[in-house]
Every structure is written in structure tokens, then in C-alpha cells.
Design a protein with these regions (language model features):
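Conserved phosphotransfer microenvironments
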Residues: 42-52, 56-83
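Conserved acidic segment of CheY-like receiver
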Residues: 2-24
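A short acidic (Asp/Glu
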Residues: 16-20, 45-46, 68-71, 102-106
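His-Asp phosphorelay/catalytic-motif detector in bacterial-type signaling
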Residues: 81-91
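Output/docking surface of receiver
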Residues: 10-12, 35-36, 70, 92-168, ...
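Short hydrophobic/Thr-rich beta-strand motif most characteristic of the beta2 strand and flanking loop
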Residues: 29-41
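C-terminal output/effector regions of signal-responsive regulators
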Residues: 136-217
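A general structural motif
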Residues: 1-3, 54-55, 88
Length: 217
């Protein structure tokens, strides 16, 4: 049963087919729906296309312009653009042994050597398992954030820390799921309004205490 939809990006058709064969061969439980695309020349155009397709993970070759000089970005730049739109999104960059992606990349944990996929016999953690685990970890973080957000929404009263956390969770969910409005605008307004009423009540109580002291005199 399909559980994960993933994308592989490479400018070379034979490499795209190679990756598709790798997933097909190693997907023992048939959980992966795998697509492979040639990158567009312009990053923004390609980014819009792939982010609208709701992939669970994106894997890309590093040197995307090696066989097609019209492509204006490499795999690391593609991943960087993806992560700006979807924080913590599962991304992987595949490189050759003589590649400089590890040196150039900010996060070495997303960079893997292509050769690992052809020599995995006896390995405890195949690359396909790394993809699966990253997706599961990402989904778990989002679900945990949603549960915490729902618990905050159900509270009758939110203090300043609760409100700050609520907005933090809302922003996180928006940037990981591409849901632009996680909390209805009116609920956010009510939350702010409750803080305003709290300030008014505190001010009124302070004024009442001052009046009482004056009356005693």
C-alpha cells in the first residue's frame, strides 16, 4: 500500500531511470510512489511545480547543469529554496565521490554518495530506509505540533506565554504543510482581545485599590 510519494530530480534520463529501478528493487513493502523529473531551466518555475505536487520527500542530483548548461542552479540551491518554503522538509542531495557538495552544503546530513545505492548488501540502513525514516520523523513532528496547537485552542484562557507558543506552532504548521491559515483569523483576534481585556481588568483593579487607599485617608 502506497504510504510515501517521493520525487527524484536529475537532468540525465539514465540517472532518473536508475533511481526508479533502485526504489522498485528495494521497496519490499511497495510503500513508495516514485516520480522522476528533469529540472526546468529556471529555479522559481521548477520550485512552484514540485511544491504543488505534495511530495513527502525530494531527492536531487547535485550537479544539475553538468549535462544541461541551461539549468541555472544546482541540487543544493534547489534544496535551499525548498527549505525556505517548507521548513524541515525531507530533502536529499546525491553526489559523486569526487563531488564538492559536502564542502558547499550547510547541512552535511542531507548529502549522500550515489555509490552507496549500488553497494548496500549487508548494510543495516539502506538509503531507501533513510528516506522513509526522515518522512516518518517529519510527519511525527507536524502531528505533535498540531496536537499541542489543538490543546492550546481548547484552553479557556491563554496567558502571554501560551499565546506566543500558539502563534509559534501556527507558523510552524503553515511552513511545513503549506496551509496558509492554520488558525482561523477570528480566533487569533479573540486571543489578542482576551489579553487586552486582561490588561483592562488589571488596570481597573489597580485604580480601585488606589481609590480605596484615598478613601481610608
Amino acid at each position: 500500500m502506497i504510504q510515501y510519494k517521493i520525487l527524484y530530480v536529475d537532468e540525465v534520463e539514465s540517472e532518473r531511470n536508475r533511481f526508479l529501478r533502485y526504489i522498485h528493487k528495494n521497496d519490499d513493502e511497495k510503500e513508495f510512489l516514485t516520480e522522476a523529473l528533469e529540472p526546468d531551466a529556471e529555479l522559481e518555475k521548477f520550485l512552484e511545480k514540485i511544491l504543488n505536487d505534495n511530495y513527502d520527500a525530494i531527492i536531487t542530483d547535485h550537479k544539475l547543469s553538468e549535462a544541461n548548461p541551461l539549468i541555472q542552479y544546482d541540487g543544493l540551491e534547489l534544496v535551499e529554496a525548498i527549505l525556505k518554503s517548507r521548513i524541515d522538509f525531507p530533502c536529499f542531495v546525491l553526489t559523486s565521490f569526487d563531488d564538492d557538495a559536502v564542502r558547499d552544503g550547510d547541512d552535511v546530513n542531507i548529502v549522500y554518495i550515489k555509490g552507496l545505492m549500488t553497494n548496500e548488501e549487508g548494510h543495516l540502513a539502506k538509503f531507501i530506509y533513510k528516506i522513509k525514516n526522515q518522512i516518518k520523523h517529519h510527519r511525527k513532528k507536524i502531528e505533535k505540533a498540531k496536537i499541542e496547537l489543538e490543546e492550546l485552542i481548547k484552553k479557556e484562557y491563554l496567558d502571554a506565554l501560551d499565546e506566543a507558543r500558539l502563534l509559534e506552532l501556527d507558523t510552524y504548521i503553515e511552513k511545513t504543510t503549506n496551509v496558509k491559515i492554520s488558525i482561523p483569523p477570528q480566533l487569533k483576534s479573540l486571543s489578542n482581545l482576551s489579553e487586552l481585556h486582561k490588561m483592562i481588568d488589571n488596570t481597573e483593579q489597580l485604580l480601585a485599590n488606589i481609590r480605596e487607599k484615598k478613601d481610608v485617608k
